Amino acid sequence: MLPSGFLMLPGGVTLALTAMVGEHLFDKIGFKPLLLTSLILLTFILSLFTTISSETTTMTAAILYAAFTIGVGLSIGPVMTLALNQVPKPLHAHGSAISNTINQVAGAIGPALYTSIMTMASQHFIQQSNEANKTLLQIKSMTSGVHTVYYVAIAFAIVSFLLTLTLKKKDQQLETQ
């Protein structure tokens, strides 16, 4: 259990620090450039996660996770701020409550979805494999499942990137109406 804590610690610290930097950059350069940059970073780091295997060291995994949290930290605060800025000031309390609820629900659905995908991909690998060594089969099937999860996450990041390209500033939205 101790190595998993050490694996997550650098990412947690990195996330906390980059969330503060993300808010500052949001004020300085705006939402769209910041989110696009963070999504490019996230996509790149997620693609690196598709190379992990049973041979990957804990240090490598910790570095990858910390790099991943840089992208998350640069995007999560500005996304929440942008969402709340779309709500009229008298309704900010309700907007904040809804935002927090959505965050909690997504936080519950995400791991369940990815675990299901990983399990299905691992089972599919086992069904398609002719590996005789059971231990090696388990390792390979789990690795296949994990890689599949990261490919799905990459797809979500790419879709998010494309959707971000369609966002307009509030004053641009008013001009087009």
Range-by-range predicted roles:
Residues 129-145:
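Short, membrane-exposed interhelical loops at transmembrane-helix boundaries
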